[in-house]
Amino acid sequence: MAKEHGAMRSVLNLIGSVMLPQDTSNCSDRHDTPSAPEFLSHLQPFQTVLLSIASFSTTIVLCLSLIHWFYVYKYVSIEKRRNKLYWLIAVFPVACSCSFIAMCVPRTAVILTCIGVLYYLMCLFVIVSLARHLFGGRESFSTCLQYDDRPIDFRSPPFCCIIPKLPTARSTEKNIRRLEWCVLQAPIVRSIIIFLDVVAVAEMREDATPYIRYSDMASLCSLLLAIFGVHTLARVTSNKLSAYCFMSMFRLVDISLLFFSAQQPMIFQNVLLRFNLISCGPLLNAQENAYFVCNFIITCEMLLLSVLATWLLAPRHNAMFDAYRPSMALSETTASLNETEQSMILDH
């Protein structure tokens, strides 16, 4: 029994070292993370440039989100649909703002990342809820899929997609509800873990690191389950909701979640920091410099995705904006009538 317990602990430590590698940087002096006034008054030249670009990117993203909000408010007539879209509109500005604030206030980098991921997880459930709404409810959702003989295919990311043969399931209300719960559990679990982490840090200080590592592994498992659930549902609905640009909307949120949550642990921690490719600075250690650069990259990525969303989800080819097409038809009719009147006048 003791041998099995030791093996399990070794496996957990190995997974933890992959997720949160130890700081192997050769910083000569150890110091506390600087406050925002201290950091902003002693910026290095490259940090000034990155902050300037990040502030510009964040401003553009916020302006684009206001434009998106206006179009949803004006051209989406169904209030329930509007309220769901408001959540999704805020994805890019929330991620961009969290990253920019974390650049300016280094002490908040970890907590703002947690808050940003929590918002993303809530938006994943909003996407599932939006798909159910567009079908007219869960019963109609299930009936439509069964009528088209579309079973639930479990070969979805992050891991099941590499398994060649998996059994399918009937698209019943019960199975759809189970997939919805796979997505809904993620924000609930993340909220509980954030609360427990705050309590652990407040009570145990530096000794809370092992507990935070295990809680991060639990939240990662919860996140992967949510990604599996939302991908499985999205793939089933892709053909039926193409007029609403649903898959484009889902892919944009999915890719931005990947950028926001996976770059820091996978690229910066497990590659750049592990091999000492990011060094210490006068005020920030290697880990904090990694967060700074990663947050800058996220602001740029959110700007690109926001511009892409403006083009891909435009009302002119998106049935989600149900009040936009009648106005277009009215304007086209008015234009044709004016042309007819002018031709009649010229004939006379």
UniProtKB/Swiss-Prot annotation:
Keywords: Cell membrane, Glycoprotein, Membrane, Transmembrane, Transmembrane helix, Transport. InterPro entries: Ostalpha/TMEM184C. Coiled coil: none annotated. GO terms for cellular component: membrane; plasma membrane. The chain crosses the membrane at residues 50-70, 85-105, 110-130, 181-201, 214-234, 241-261, 292-312. It is found in: Cell membrane. Its main location: membrane. Glycans are attached at residue 26. GO terms for molecular function: transmembrane transporter activity. Residues 1-49, 106-109, 202-213, 262-291 are extracellular. Residues 71-84, 131-180, 235-240, 313-348 are cytoplasmic. It is a multi-pass membrane protein. Belongs to the OST-alpha family. Probable transporter. PANTHER family: ORGANIC SOLUTE TRANSPORTER-RELATED. This is Organic solute transporter alpha-like protein 3. The lineage of its organism: Eukaryota, Metazoa, Ecdysozoa, Nematoda, Chromadorea. The gene is osta-3.
